């Protein structure tokens, strides 16, 4: 019986996070709620706003917290727009803003032009990221499905495994 099923990649739709985490939808492109999430890690894009993209993983959800927001707030609107456009051009699954922070007009415009889901939560960044990572780990955890029947023989548990339809249940009948 092959055990390579555990290496299978899992994914789920973005809408599941929106519902579970009770996120406010600021902007959702057409069919954006069906964007598939397949990475259990997240990214805080502070270094990317500063221009460093060498190890940037565009498969991850991006979480913008107070630190990133404060940095963007120090920039002139044209520079802020450029930095935001550059980040959102990478087409990651979604951008989530924490602490009910104000959405910069440049951020909303860029989300629309890049067809990027833009979501917001009132939770603090550390609480939200902890909940989100736990949720992602649960949804994307490796799993295996096996066909079997569990029986007791002289007080010991025995698990009979086999392909579907080969007679495991019939074997277990007394």
Which ranges hold each PLM region?
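P-loop NTPase nucleotide-binding/switch module
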Residues: 136-155
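Fold-independent oxyanion-binding glycine-rich loops
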Residues: 65-67, 99-100, 122, 154-156, ...
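Gly/Thr-rich phosphate-binding loop signature of adenosyl cofactor/nucleotide-binding cores
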Residues: 2-87
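Charged, amphipathic alpha-helical linker segments immediately N-terminal to NTP-binding catalytic cores
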Residues: 91-94, 100-136
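Short secondary-structure boundary/capping elements
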Residues: 75-79, 99, 103, 143
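Glycine-rich phosphate-binding P-loop
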Residues: 156-174
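Hydrophobic/aromatic ligand-binding patch that stacks against planar heteroaromatic rings
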Residues: 86, 110, 174
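Structural motif
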Residues: 60-63, 93-96, 116-119, 157-159
């Amino acid at each position: 019986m092959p055990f390579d099923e555990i290496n299978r990649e899992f994914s789920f739709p973005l809408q599941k996070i929106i519902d579970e985490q009770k996120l406010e939808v600021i902007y959702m492109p057409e069919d954006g709620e069906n964007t598939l999430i397949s990475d259990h890690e997240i990214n805080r894009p502070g270094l990317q706003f500063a221009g460093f993209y060498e190890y940037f993983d565009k498969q991850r959800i991006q979480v913008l917290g107070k630190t990133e927001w404060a940095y963007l707030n120090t920039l002139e609107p044209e520079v802020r727009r450029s930095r935001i456009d550059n980040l959102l051009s990478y087409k990651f699954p979604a951008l989530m803003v924490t602490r009910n922070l104000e959405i910069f007009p440049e951020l909303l415009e860029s989300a629309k032009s890049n067809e990027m889901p833009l979501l917001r939560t009132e939770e603090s960044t550390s609480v939200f990221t902890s909940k989100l990572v736990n949720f992602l780990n649960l949804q994307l955890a490796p799993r295996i499905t096996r066909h079997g029947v569990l029986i007791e023989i002289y007080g010991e548990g025995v698990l009979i495994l086999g392909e579907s339809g080969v007679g495991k249940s019939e074997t277990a009948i007394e």
